[in-house]
Regions:
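Long, contiguous regulatory modules within eukaryotic nuclear regulatory proteins
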Residues: 2-5, 77-136
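Extracellular/lumenal glycan-associated surfaces
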Residues: 2-19, 35-43, 51, 59-73, ...
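Non-Sec secretion/translocation targeting segments of pathogen effectors
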Residues: 3, 115-119, 151, 240-263
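Classical N-terminal secretory signal peptides
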Residues: 13-16, 48-50, 55, 98, ...
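Polybasic, proline/glycine-rich intrinsically disordered low-complexity segments
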Residues: 22-62, 136-240
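Charged, compositionally biased non-catalytic regions
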Residues: 42, 48-98
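Long, compositionally biased, charged low-complexity segments
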Residues: 68-69, 236-244
Length: 263
């Protein structure tokens, strides 16, 4: 297997499409470990039934020091005594989170929110009247396609605000659509603590940041146009049905009146 520093994986020399991601391996002292299928020459899946063996490899700084030095713009001398974790995880952000207890922040329409995993919310800074954005309330707004939340947001109250999807006919004027990452990506350390896992779990894969910027998404680029179109069609059908009913009632009354005069 070749060590691909840029893709963070092992690639079989004779079969380049066969790769093993470092992120799929377990972190152990001085390296990584994984179960290896001798038949598939890869990490076994759920239906594998061939012979397996436990493999342990050194860290990437040991396997390819020159490649790691080039990737992280360090000299080989500067690379000495550093671990994969030192290079792959922002150490300033890590120390701010662990040593100083600083919560990550995210900017939403010019206002700063704290990513508070313990309270299960994005908590607005210096705004005690706002209840902020509670993750449990926006669970159904997570987009698998975007791999992020896309929610209706009220910039005045600085809160998530649910829409009435059964009756909405136009884009809301006082609300905007904002997009931001899943809470594990916003604060992986807080996520690990809350789940009872090692605080360094998945940090090399996810990365670590102290601040994020939420994106504002035009309503026309969300799922809302489809819902509005469907509601307008339903409204049109109801209107037509009502007109037909009124016409039928009117005709019936006219017919009854005509019969009365004949009598």
């Amino acid at each position: 297997f070749l060590v691909d520093i840029n893709k963070v994986e092992l690639r079989e020399k004779e079969n380049p499409v066969n790769t093993i991601s470092i992120y799929e391996m377990r972190d152990v002292v001085d390296g990584y470990a994984f179960n290896y299928s001798l038949q598939e020459k890869n990490i076994p899946n759920l239906i594998s039934n061939g012979e397996e063996t436990l493999i342990k490899i050194s860290e990437l700084v040991v396997l390819d020091p020159a490649g790691m030095a080039e990737k992280y713009k360090l000299s080989l001398e500067e690379l000495k005594n550093k671990t994969d974790f030192d290079l792959m995880v922002d150490q300033t952000a890590f120390n701010d989170r662990i040593q100083k207890g600083m919560l990550p922040t995210i900017d939403i329409q010019g206002h700063t929110f704290y990513v508070d995993i313990r309270m299960d919310m994005l908590r607005p800074k210096d705004d005690f009247l706002s209840k902020g954005i509670v993750f449990d309330e926006i669970d159904h707004y997570f987009s698998e396609e975007a791999n992020a939340y896309i929610i209706p947001y009220n910039p005045k109250t600085r809160e998530f605000q649910e829409l009435d999807y059964d009756s909405i006919l136009v884009f809301p004027k006082d609300l905007i659509a904002v997009q931001f990452p899943f809470q594990r990506d916003l604060d992986p350390i807080g996520w690990n603590r809350n789940g009872g896992w090692n605080i360094k779990e998945d940090l090399k894969r996810i990365g670590l940041k102290s601040h994020f910027e939420a994106k504002t998404i035009p309503w026309k680029e969300t799922f809302l146009p489809q819902i509005i179109t469907e509601n307008l069609m339903v409204l049109k059908e109801k209107t037509i049905k009502k007109k037909l009913q009124n016409k039928s009632v009117s005709f019936s009354k006219k017919e009854q009146g005509s019969k009365g005069r004949k009598m």
